[in-house]
Structures are given as structure tokens and as C-alpha cells.
From Swiss-Prot:
One GO molecular-function entry: DNA-binding transcription factor activity, RNA polymerase II-specific
Protein's recorded name: Putative T-box protein 32
Annotated organism of origin: Caenorhabditis elegans
Taxon lineage: Eukaryota, Metazoa, Ecdysozoa, Nematoda, Chromadorea
Transmembrane segments: none
Residue segments, region Disordered: 268-289
GO cellular component: chromatin; nucleus
Length: 441
């Protein structure tokens, strides 16, 4: 180690300082952290050194201070625990050494210092002016190196720099706040309590599709239009649907009427056994073929009336026109009305409204004729299936059939009255009770 007093011929020139517990040499250039806070914190590194080259008989006083290495300001890069720092930029703070802290042992001989070494315990550092003694004022993010001053009893002093031990100061509070801030940001973005940004719903304006004239749709609208507000039925097809919902299908109505006819016939009113036999026959759907044929003929006539009503001139015209292609059949070409209405969509639309009015009047007349025909048919059905006076008299005689079940119930009550005393007398003998019960039965 060189000294600033090397030009003087004194024994201080040969002093050597080594750090105890460290194998580092002066060629090492990495830094060790010294945490600084507003309050006093003790230096985490051991300030314990061995000394060589002192005069054993002379008295020496040893003190320590921290000096700036360079004019750079350092920046942390990498792991916080690793202490990876590098010079970042020039520092605006001038290079000044800290105050010296004198060892508590005072003046001691060179032999004693070389034997025990020198140790500075509980030296604190702070980034503000400390209120306590034995505390050094340091700047954050700057590099320092310890310097030992040897003072003899004659007043000669020598400073020895310990280059094998370098420090860089960092603020614990600032680094922890940065880590805390980063952790908070991570929780806000990925944690369960992360703030959810409202979703922006984009509305795209749909393109307006122009309507295309279609003659088939116009005719369908004509069939779905009601004849008038006072009319009971919209069309024969609608009437048939309502009739099916009200009375069921034709086969169900046929079966229901045949059951009633057979139950009211004079042949089935002769005795209760015959009535039970007729009910069994009706449950098996074995009906009279003659009545079923008459009902089939009636409803076939009704279906024929519906089919004749649905066929109108507009149906024939719509079949001869191909709506998907611009071609015309021979029937439409020979007809002058088609040539006049197919000139343009407007003309076709006008003719469709005219045909709509005529079809409404025609449908109204056909519906009136259809209703008259329905009245006539159902009157015939009522006359055909209305029971005669003889059948009604036979039905009144059916009340006498209830006497037989009453007599049977009286006999069963008498039987129970005969069994009850036997059960009370022979409770202990179970075999006698069962024997008496089977004999009575």
C-alpha cells in the first residue's frame, strides 16, 4: 500500500492492511451493498483488519472513514440480493470524505495492534444528518471505500486505503417501495381483485336489402287475409282446422258416433249381460260397417266441397307462371290478360289487387253455400242418430237392473255377520277360523 506521506522518511511507509475473513485482493472490482435509511443503520460488513509493518515500540492511534471512489452515480441492474451495480452517470454531488471515527482503545503500541488487529464495531451509516455518534453520512447510489488513518504520538499521520473492500450505498426504503409497487401492479392486472375494464360493444350498421316483388307471396297473402270482420270463418281450410281441434279427426268422430249408436240400439237394451257385451265390443273398436260406410261417404263429400272451394282461377294462373325464371308457358302467351299484366311489376301488382277483390267476393259466396251445405248435412245426421221412443223406453227400463247388485250386497253383508261371531269365539284356533271361512265362501 502506498501512502500520501511516502516522501517522508518514517516507519509508516511499510504498513500493510488486510481484511480478516476475506480472500479478496486489490484487483477485485465488484461492490458490496450498504443499506442506508433515514435513521441510523449499522454497516453490514465486518470492519476487522490485520496490520503489519508497525514499529512495535511506537504508539499509534487508528481511525476510520469512508471515501468516494469516483464521481459516478451507480444504478442497480439484476437481482436485488446479488448487488449488481454499474456506473450510470456523473454525480452532481462533489467528492467529499466522511468524518473520521476514532477507535475506542486510543493509543496503543504497534506490537499490540499487530497482535490483536483492529476492529470497529457498531458503526452506523445514514443518508441524513445523524443525531447519534459513531454514524457516517453517506449519499445513496455512490461507491465508497474504507480508509484507515494511523497517527503517531509525535503527530505524524498516514492514510491507508483498503482497496480490497468496496461498498455501494443503496436505500432500502426506496428499493422496497419499488418492489411493492411492482407487486401491486401485478396484482391489479392478473389477481382476483383486478379491475375489469368495460367491454366496448361495436354496432355495425346492417345493409338494407331492397324488397323484390314476388307474385307468389302476394297470392299467399290473399289467401291468409280475412274475408271481413263479421265473418265467422276465414277460409274453408281454417274451418277444417277448427273443426278438427274441436271434434277430433274424422276417424275419431266416426268411432265416437258408432259407439253411441250401438249403446242406444234396441238389441243391446234387452238385458245387463247384453249391455256389458256391447260395451266390450265397443272397447275393441268392432263397429257396425254400415254406419262407418255412411260416415265415410258424408265426410268424403265434405272434403270434396273443400277441394272445389280451394281451386280458383288464381291457382291456375300461378301454376302457369314461373316466378324464378323469366319464361312464360303457352297458356299465358295466348291469354291477353297475362300479356297485359306481365309488362311491368307495377302493372302486375295492380292486377293482383283487382283479382284480390274479386276473389274475396267469390270466397264469400262460396262460404255461404258451404255453410248451408253443412247445416243440411248435420241435420240429416241428427235425424238419423236421434233415439226413437222405443229406445228411450228401453233405457228407462234399465233402472231395474240395479236390483241385482243390491241383492248381492245384502247377501254379502249377511255372510259377514255369520263370520264375525266365529272369529270372536275361535281366536286362538286359527285352523278353525280358516276352515269356517272357506265353508261359508
Amino acid at each position: 500500500m502506498t501512502s500520501q506521506y511516502s516522501n517522508y522518511s518514517c516507519p509508516l511507509n511499510n504498513i500493510q492492511v488486510n481484511v480478516i475473513g476475506s480472500s479478496r485482493t486489490s484487483d477485485d472490482h465488484f461492490l458490496e451493498q450498504m443499506l442506508t435509511k433515514r435513521k441510523k443503520t449499522n454497516i453490514s460488513q465486518d470492519l476487522h483488519y490485520t496490520l503489519l509493518g508497525l514499529n512495535p515500540r511506537d504508539l499509534y492511534q487508528i481511525s476510520i472513514k469512508l471515501a468516494r471512489i469516483d464521481e459516478k452515480k451507480y444504478k442497480f441492474n439484476g437481482n436485488f440480493n446479488g448487488g449488481d451495480y454499474y456506473p450510470h452517470k456523473n454525480s452532481e454531488i462533489p467528492m467529499e470524505d466522511t468524518e473520521e471515527i476514532v477507535h475506542l482503545d486510543g493509543y496503543q503500541t504497534g506490537a499490540r495492534w499487530m497482535k490483536t488487529g483492529v476492529y470497529f464495531p457498531k458503526i452506523g451509516i445514514s443518508k441524513e444528518q445523524p443525531d447519534k455518534e459513531r454514524c457516517l453520512l453517506l449519499e445513496s447510489l455512490h461507491a465508497y471505500v474504507p480508509v484507515l488513518r494511523f497517527t503517531t504520538s509525535s503527530g505524524i499521520s498516514l492514510e491507508v486505503t483498503v482497496w480490497s473492500q468496496k461498498f455501494v450505498t443503496t436505500m432500502t426504503s426506496s428499493n422496497r417501495s419499488v418492489k411493492r409497487r411492482e407487486k401491486r401492479k401485478l396484482e391489479e392486472t392478473t389477481g382476483p381483485s383486478a379491475k375489469k375494464t368495460p367491454e366496448v360493444i361495436e354496432f355495425t350498421q346492417e345493409a338494407v336489402v331492397p324488397e323484390v316483388y314476388n307474385a307468389q307471396q302476394v297470392y299467399q297473402m290473399q289467401n291468409d287475409t280475412m274475408i271481413s270482420s263479421d265473418s265467422k270463418f276465414c277460409s274453408p281450410l281454417a274451418f277444417q282446422q277448427d273443426f278438427t281441434e274441436e271434434f277430433g279427426t274424422i276417424s275419431q268422430l266416426d268411432a265416437y258416433v258408432n259407439v253411441n249408436v250401438q249403446s242406444c240400439s234396441s238389441s243391446s237394451l234387452s238385458s245387463p249381460a247384453a249391455l256389458q257385451q256391447d260395451s266390450t265390443v265397443s272397447s275393441d273398436n268392432d263397429f257396425d260397417d254400415k254406419n262407418s260406410e255412411e260416415f265415410d261417404a258424408v265426410f268424403e263429400y265434405i272434403d270434396q266441397q273443400f277441394s272445389n272451394h280451394d281451386q280458383n282461377p288464381m291457382d291456375q294462373q300461378s301454376k302457369s307462371i314461373d316466378l324464378n325464371q323469366t319464361t312464360w308457358t303457352s297458356q299465358s302467351i295466348n291469354n291477353q290478360s297475362y300479356l297485359s299484366t306481365a309488362s311491368s311489376p307495377a302493372a302486375l301488382n295492380q292486377d293482383s289487387f283487382a283479382s284480390e277483390k274479386s276473389s274475396i267476393v267469390r270466397d264469400k259466396k262460396n262460404d255461404e253455400n258451404c255453410l248451408d251445405e253443412f247445416d243440411r248435412v248435420f241435420n240429416e245426421l241428427d235425424q238419423q242418430f236421434t233415439p226413437t221412443e222405443n229406445q228411450l223406453q228401453d233405457l228407462s227400463n234399465c233402472t231395474t237392473w240395479n236390483q241385482e247388485p243390491i241383492n248381492n250386497s245384502i247377501q254379502s253383508n249377511q255372510l259377514n255377520n255369520n263370520i264375525a261371531p266365529a272369529l270372536e269365539e275361535n281366536v286362538e284356533d286359527d285352523n278353525a277360523i280358516f276352515e269356517h271361512f272357506f265353508i261359508c265362501n
